[in-house]
Design a protein with these regions (language model features):
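Compositionally biased terminal segments of proteins
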Residues: 1-142
């Protein structure tokens, strides 16, 4: 609800950045953003464990647009998924109590990400398998 005299001005956001770099978040993702932030010297910082659900949402949105036949740069799809795989494999993650909508999106991402052991090796991640990544993401977010 806008205050008296307030106006909305539509702005164009380049399609390649709109999925992750959203200006407006729905209530569930805004709640997740607040839950996952630390304030350091007056700056809000999103902890890395909480960045993963946002990257998963970006991947899901891009993947859905791709399925509908819209132009999606496949490098963006690959980047979001590979970033999540690297973070899960290389960082110590905290258990995140996600809002239900975000948790549902994470479950969809885990189900749809289709990572293989060969892709893990291609990322030069040693001592980790695709199933390890799926299990870790499930344990941390679901």
């Amino acid at each position: 609800i806008l205050e008296d005299g307030a106006e909305l001005t539509p702005i164009h956001i380049d399609d390649s950045i709109s999925s992750l770099s959203a200006i407006l978040l729905n209530d569930s993702y805004y709640d997740a953003l607040l839950r996952g932030r630390d304030v350091i010297d007056g700056f809000s910082i999103l902890r890395h464990s909480w960045l993963i659900p946002f990257k998963a949402k970006a991947w899901l949105d891009l993947n859905e647009r791709n399925r509908r036949g819209e132009h999606v740069d496949s490098r963006n799809l690959k980047k979001h998924r590979n970033d999540i795989i690297r973070m899960a494999a290389e960082l110590v993650l905290e258990r995140c109590e996600l809002p239900e909508e975000v948790k549902s999106d994470m479950a969809n991402f885990i189900e749809e990400m289709n990572v293989t052991d060969q892709e893990i090796r291609n990322l030069k991640l040693r001592g980790v398998k695709a199933e390890d990544i799926r299990r870790l993401l499930t344990d941390m977010y679901l």
